Amino acid sequence: MPLLDGPRNGETVTASAHNGIPIIDGVDPSTLRGDIDQDPNRRQKIVVVGLGMVAVAFIEKLVKLDSERRKYDIVVIGEEPHIAYNRVGLSSYFEHRKIEDLYLNPKEWYGSFKDRSFDYYLNTRVTDVFPQHKTVKTSTGDIVSYDILVLATGSDAVLPTSTPGHDAKGIFVYRTISDLERLMEFAANHKGQTGVTVGGGLLGLEAAKAMTDLEDFGSVKLIDRNKWVLARQLDGDAGSLVTKKIRDLGLEVLHEKRVAKIHTDDDNNVTGILFEDGQELDCCCICFAIGIRPRDELGGSTGIQCAKRGGFVIDESLRTSVNDIYAIGECASWENQTFGIIAPGIEMADVLSFNLTNPDKEPKRFNRPDLSTKLKLLGVDVASFGDFFADRDGPKFLPGQRPSAESIGAADPNREEEPQVKALTYRDPFGGVYKKYLFTMDGKYLLGGMMIGDTKDYVKLNQMVKSQKPLEVPPSEFILGAQSGGEENADDLDDSTQICSCHNVTKGDVVESVKSGTCKTIADVKSCTKAGTGCGGCMPLVQSIFNKTMLDMGQEVSNNLCVHIPYSRADLYNVIAIRQLRTFDDVMKSAGKCPDSLGCEICKPAIASILSSLFNPHLMDKEYHELQETNDRFLANIQRNGTFSVVPRVPGGEITADKLIAIGQVAKKYNLYCKITGGQRIDMFGARKQDLLDIWTELVDAGMESGHAYAKSLRTVKSCVGTTWCRFGVGDSVGMAIRLEQRYKSIRAPHKFKGAVSGCVRECAEAQNKDFGLIATEKGFNIFVGGNGGAKPRHSELLAKDVPPEEVIPILDRYVIFYIRTADKLQRTARWLESLPGGIEYLKDVVLNDKLGIAAEMERQMQELVDSYFCEWTETVRNPKRRKYFQQFANTDETVENVEIVKEREQVRPTYWPKDGANEDFKGHQWSSLSWQPVIKADYFSDGPPAISSANIKRGDTQLAIFKVKGKYYATQQMCPHKRTFVLSDGLIGDDDNGKYWVSCPYHKRNFELNGEQAGRCQNDEAMNIATFPVEEREDGWIYMKLPPVEELDSVLGTEKWKVKKGEAVDPFEAYDKKYSGMKGKRAGAKGIEGSKPTRSPSNTIDW
């Protein structure tokens, strides 16, 4: 078995290799070899020390090249507790905090090898190597034999141990996940203070970005001993431009500073820095990113030669000074150089894997590596390629000749040499672009260069340097051509061009993976070739090559909605509109690939949205209800514990006291958590499904309507008070906001959209980050469109100026309808506007100038939608037939709590989700016995259409989901293991061409198969599965399930066992509350603090 967590305490852990070669604990290594070499048929064992990016690259390449001969078994020993992760993308960890997102391969990959040919240790260090016995010893005491040993131990971050205070609390390095987690924990406890990064190289800028992304420090400063950042890659002009761009982003950079001493307090906490020039800087945290030191400690006693500057000495075949021991990556010293970037390590892995698997062929040689880099650092595009310092240091090589000693200025220091290189430089101070290309004196050869701000020609130019071919165009065209726009294009690149330097992937590799049929999607290409899985900077080119290759093969690069619909969302909208298709079945018969397909979790909501945008049916009507996502299905947003939120509409944020009181009475009666939203209305959380009808009955009776907080439709139109109250107001923002919200409420779109109206340029309503926003002027309103907040914020753009109030509606009608007609699935207006050819100018032509001649038609369509408005909740509460949809269980009126509720700040909320889900093998569980048991009457389920209906039933303490799909029944557990949520019966059902059905969890779209040999398997997360049960309808009118005894069923799937309870998850504020406990104000405010009291009780109040 592969070891995922290393050895457990008190146990001897072994990892068996093929043919019985053991890993033995506590045995004299001299006795280990024994008769191992006497078996001529055995596979050789390669032991890899280290499990980093280079080690994994070597293993992947070796396995691929050895797939036919099967000559080798592999054991890899990793020192970190994690499987191999992407160290190049380390800074992204601060954004998602998920180590799994950095894994180079999923955990399943490590267990996918046949014949036990691959084993691995984690959290285990190799402490000794015994070359004479061909064994290594680990930190757990295990002795591991090898035939070939590959050292891929990497490097350590350098810490200035000679600097006083280097061991203080608050000193960090930037190298591993553990380093980042310690830094994150420290930063969280020192909010608002100053953090410092020391080092202005590649790693230093990454560390500075990481500290900035934490958002805990009040300020972050970058300390660099050089005159400009990236001094090893850039000249002074380029480095100074990068420094300026970084400063413009708010990061303070201090150049020509060397740390002399680190100041500390009596508890050895960092308090500041003393520089060698006598200046001082106050700070609480210092992250050193000043270089790396090769991990070569295994060299000393083993006889493996190490270089003076560190690293195992290797030759051009990657051999060390000891037979059958090789070194690759940052721990290897080639010609007294070590390399701290990934590309040379990948090249080493390529050379060694080829030579080990092709002994009969001419061996590959490791030559001077390409140290070119292309990165995005702190939002700045930076690239250097080829011999980028040839003008400063003299050329390392001149095409067609070898430079003499004189030519590189080494023969006679007193002789004034003629230059061997000419530089062509381009500067654009307005666009922040700098380019310097270095040519031979005759301009026939490109030697190298550097780029800032615009790096799209990097791959093409780097290949020109590598090819050493005479140029076909004059040097001037490199600059003139660079000024033209356009995306990265791979059409004119040779197949030998390296596209991905992180993993040494060429254009030909990508092309071949597609042409061979191995890769049919861009995700397949990334998985197969590893292109784009390092720093990710090559992805535009990889996408371009993939698209071009697919087109060359006659394959269309699809933007189809999904596998069931051969149209884009915009095309499908037009098909449905022109053919007047009014149901899902009509759409599938007219526009689907298979007329009787069930669709899937992608096309069903998209088609439902289009039907609503065109015809506005009630979502709970029989033919539409099954198409809806869970939110639309129950007209409310589902929350973490399976309850829902209730949001009445508050147009423009204006509400009467009576309606506020009604909301308060409802919230108190049903014990709902209340919160004011960013859209100026009140959200009530924690409503049980079975209470939604009663809650909305009371709200409707109080004169309120659905706020559509659950829908991909208009949410709110926010407003400031404008001229209604404000002394600075220029226009009536409240009046306009209410009119707009009342006009566009309930209208479905490809995604949610929001509006705002500000009464003057002070912009209190934040209209310029909304899908549409208005700002009052003396002449009317300026209309802005295409903005949003969210994960990728975007300021809106000005569509029209000084529009009179009566002319606002036609403009917005056209804008919204054009968006509904042409946007892609789940595309916000910001991304839609960016994708329009010509952007805002094109939109102006369509909306304002009627370029397409459809303005009147779009206004008419909007008016029809506005006239068709009805409140969905008002209609629902008046229809008693819909009550059955709002039961928790279909077979009983009982109710259960799915997540433990806690009280906080005088309100209730569900306890936090734990980090891990329920990863037990429910699918493979062996029940002691199964018997047929009646569970629910068959008439609960629809005979169709629609072709699908479902129910959640309760058996003992266990919740079970039953699905009726095209007349057949399927049954599973109700709990989705991912977050232990009891919701599967509310999930959308999908199918494929092979008749395979799946249910998609409403929360995070884990898809579980319902039928076939793999029933219960999760299609998109192999770490989890669900239990399935036989189920059938019988002549007595009941549905029967084949179930184990109730007690046994509850012991495996019971709600009480799996519902999330308080204490399972880490309290995010535990450290904060511990640190700041007891800090209370001296006046009124918090409960329990004596404060001012009203002089008299207000009348006509409710009991809050």
From Swiss-Prot:
The record's annotation in Gene3D superfamilies points to: BFD-like [2Fe-2S]-binding domain, FAD/NAD(P)-binding domain, Rieske [2Fe-2S] iron-sulphur domain, Sulfite Reductase Hemoprotein, domain 1
Which residues does the annotation say bind FAD?
A: 44-79
Name this polypeptide is given: Nitrite reductase [NAD(P)H]
Q: Keyword annotations for this protein?
A: 2Fe-2S, 4Fe-4S, FAD, Flavoprotein, Heme, Iron, Iron-sulfur, Metal-binding, NADP, Nitrate assimilation, Oxidoreductase
Residue positions annotated to bind NAD(+) are 146-176
Q: In which residue ranges is the amino acid composition biased (Polar residues)? A: 1094-1104
Give a Pfam family name: Pyr_redox_2
- Provide the organism lineage as a comma list: Eukaryota, Fungi, Dikarya, Ascomycota, Pezizomycotina
Q: How is the cofactor bound?
A: Binds 1 siroheme per subunit.
Q: Does the keyword Iron apply?
A: yes
Note the PROSITE patterns from the entry: NIR_SIR, RIESKE
State which gene encodes it.
niiA
Q: Which domain of life is it from?
A: Eukaryota
What GO molecular function annotations does the UniProt record carry, in alphabetical order?
2 iron, 2 sulfur cluster binding; 4 iron, 4 sulfur cluster binding; heme binding; metal ion binding; nitrite reductase [NAD(P)H] activity
